[in-house]
């Protein structure tokens, strides 16, 4: 929410012209691990209970299973159903990967990122190229995913094999300015439009 509300100010540059808006914190994850079915039930309940006052949803989380080429994930199908049923729009993060640390090709988008109705968001760096960690499509049946990309920082492989972060500024849990990188940050920025 820090990036959605204050992203431009924190970066000291105009990217999306953040304006004030009503923000609902709909916690759908437990403090421990959660099964995909339970997560989907929590998301469905949050949308069902709040769809009349909240039309735009930022879903910056993933089930860490790569999408398939010919089959849509249950996660993606449920997200599409919820959007049709309740007249909402979901902005979904595409997911992060670390293949660049092993000099391997980028991984496929995660489950849920194959939703046809969701706006799936990847991350770009300061040079406006896809961030090293940002996962890629295509979606099932050749669908184009992600739909959009926005600034999400960058992770680099250093000369000594260490990870170097050029992060996005937001707020830490204790309210201090901190930085990190990820498609979740890019998704928050886009959903604030």
Model-predicted regions and their roles:
Residues 25-28, 59, 123, 150:
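Hydrophobic side chains in beta-strands
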Residues 108-191:
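Extracellular S/T/G-rich loop segment that most often corresponds to the catalytic His/Ser-adjacent loop
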Residues 28-115, 174-187:
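Substrate-binding/access-modulating region of protease and related hydrolase catalytic domains
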Residues 5-9, 150, 191-193:
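Short glycine/serine- and small hydrophobic-enriched flexible loop segments
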Residues 1-36, 87, 114-117, 139-145, ...:
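Subtilisin-like serine protease catalytic core
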């Amino acid at each position: 929410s820090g990036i959605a509300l204050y992203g431009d100010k924190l970066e000291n540059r105009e990217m999306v012209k953040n304006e004030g808006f009503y923000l609902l914190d709909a916690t759908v994850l437990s403090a421990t691990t959660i099964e995909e079915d339970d997560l989907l039930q929590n998301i469905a309940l949050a949308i069902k209970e709040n769809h009349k006052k909240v039309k735009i949803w930022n879903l910056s989380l993933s089930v860490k299973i790569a999408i398939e080429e010919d089959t849509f994930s249950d996660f993606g199908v449920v997200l599409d159903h919820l959007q049709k049923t309740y007249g909402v729009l979901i902005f979904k993060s595409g997911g992060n990967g670390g293949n660049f640390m092993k000099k391997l090709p980028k991984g496929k988008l995660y489950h849920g990122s194959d939703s046809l109705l969701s706006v799936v968001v990847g991350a770009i760096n300061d040079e406006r190229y896809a961030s090293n960690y940002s996962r890629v499509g295509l979606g099932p049946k050749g669908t184009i995913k992600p739909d959009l990309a926005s600034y999400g920082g960058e992770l680099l492989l250093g000369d000594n094999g260490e990870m170097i972060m050029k992060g996005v500024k937001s707020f830490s849990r204790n309210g201090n300015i901190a930085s990190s990188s990820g498609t979740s940050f890019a998704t928050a920025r886009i959903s604030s439009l």
